[in-house]
Amino acid sequence: MSKKSEVKLREKLGFLAFSTSTNIVFNFKNLYYLIFLTNVLKIPVGTAGTMLTIGTIWDAINDPLIALFTANHTFKNGEKVRPFALYCCIPWAITIILLFTNFHLGGNLAAIAGVAIYFVFEALYTFLCMPYNSLAALTSKDDMDRKSINAYRSLGGCLGSGIGSVLVPVIVKMFGGLKGENAIIGEGDSIPLFLTACTMGALCIVGSLIHYFTSKERVKQESDNEDKIGLFEAYRMLFSCKSWVLNMFYIICYGISTALVMNSINYYAAYIMGSSAAATPILACYLVMAVVTSILTPMIDEKIGRRKTMVIAGLALIVGKIPFIFAPYSPFGIYFNALTMGFGATVTFVMFNTNRNNIADILEYQNDRRIDSLVAGGDNLVSKLAEAGALSLMTSMMASAGFDESLGLGQTAETIKTIISLLGVIPMAVAVVTVTVAFFINTKKELEESKQKASLTK
């Protein structure tokens, strides 16, 4: 029996459920937490940006540390990562509720409490994402299985985006928020956002449990080497792999681009289109394209090859920004931007995760150790530091431009220009780098070379 037949639809749907639940929180937090800090808690945008930057730096630092712990730890049932989905889902759901809780502290106390909660949230998120980032490689060694699993993960991400962003205004309104025809998120939305976060937390728990009870770790390390790995040794192994280094830069570009766009879209909707709810149809457009692309990506990859697929995705991200740059107030510009972002970002997500799965195999051939958790945890350190820099750039640009929540729709002309650049010129420049890096990635070639070298030494 082929390995491919081992991964049934039920298991892939479990990946989809888990990806949906985690992306609910990720996208809900990405889209609404910054504006919650500035418009509900009344924290200055510069301070709020610093909070997110500190939190993201902490998230970047804890990634390789937690990944190293995971690589050196085995659960009593012999598994490496799957049980984290069971043990961490409830604590993580609680932290997302706390993130959107208004404790009415005011001033510096609100900022300090926010950072503390954010630290716990990010640490638990890292533990919970061990299955999310590593289990595809541990479920099967078949490349088609892995691409299919990553496509289901991407599809789950789209559904998570739908629940966490497109449907959020509806849920907030259901709980009594966003009142008025052109409502902008404000202090009166504190309780509705809190109740929405409770709903999101419950959905996350359900998705994580579904994934835990439907998945299985099948791929085991071939050698019996169980020596503990130190942090420096882990990074020596990672940086010796050319594919890991290039894929790290590929992921950095993806993270910066999505962080800028997802954190800027609500400001564009609120202060350029006149209503926070205007983000809903734009995100729906992005979501539909992402869903279709998730289904098609494995077939595109199989037809034209991984490198061409990655390059085409990057080119789509570049082309999609051109109409928006020249006509930023045009509905066509913003919707075409959303469509191409849905295609390009989704293909990039599936590709870099499939690359990660191959890289885990490459490293095993090179070092006689499977370090699946470190493949993702290692590159997350640098990519999240880059995202932190992107968020810091965004908020400092807005603060310098004179953004002031109390001005409502009367923001300065410089603020409007800044918001437009965060959705246009800046992510376009990042996409140029994405295409350049994608052109040089060839994981299949390095995998075959490493496999041949390993066979000669045995």
Regions found by a protein language model. Give the residues of each.
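Membrane-embedded alpha-helical bundles of multi-pass transporters/translocases
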Residues: 2-458
